A protein has these predicted regions:
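Short, contiguous alpha-helical
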Residues: 1-9, 15, 21-32, 43-83, ...
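Short, surface-exposed alpha-helical recognition segments that flank or form part
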Residues: 15, 19-23, 88, 92-95
Length: 171
């Protein structure tokens, strides 16, 4: 409509680094959202799968993975401590996941604007974000399946909320 009236429409240029950070932010927030919405009965329940981990252990793994690369890349920036899968509570895990999200956005965001290097990681900053979005989605799928197998399926509203990336990215 604006063009029909002879008014030029101006759009901000697309910045891939910003788009990657926004996508990661949403994905990481979904991790935290899922933990906050989990039925309490599934947190420490033994896995029904052979050689399976508890949901607490899966969430601990989600959080702990990648922390060392962040510490090496930006030693001066605060990176959350690793979680202990044996004693972590859902509230502690949710807080830690939020802290990790903020650390990744700060550290990897800076790397994306610089040389793209994540110290010790075999790929660049964009690869780091992509790798961990896929990694985390895989484990979210395991958590959802395991909750169902334990007789406590994730609520429909929570499942819908996991796909509301625009909303999650703003939280």
């Amino acid at each position: 409509m604006a063009q029909a009236l002879g008014v030029a429409r101006t759009r901000r240029p697309f910045v891939a680094a910003d788009a990657l950070l926004k996508a990661y932010s949403a994905s990481a927030r979904v991790n935290q959202y899922l933990v906050q919405e989990l039925p309490a009965a599934v947190w420490r329940a033994p896995s029904p799968l052979p050689k399976g981990r508890t949901i607490a252990a899966l969430v601990t793994h989600l959080h702990n993975c990648g922390l060392r690369y962040l510490e090496r890349t930006a030693p001066g920036i605060s990176v959350p401590a690793e979680l202990d899968r044996v004693c972590v509570t859902p509230a502690q895990a949710a807080r830690a996941l939020g802290a990790k999200r903020r650390a990744v956005l700060a550290i990897v965001g800076t790397a994306l604007k610089g040389d793209g290097r994540i110290v010790g990681f075999p790929y660049d900053a964009a690869g780091y974000l992509s790798y961990y979005m896929v990694h985390d989605a895989h484990h979210r799928g395991q958590i959802v399946l395991q909750a169902r197998l334990l007789g406590h399926p994730i609520r429909r509203q929570t499942m819908i909320g996991m796909w509301q990336w625009s909303k999650r990215a703003k939280e």
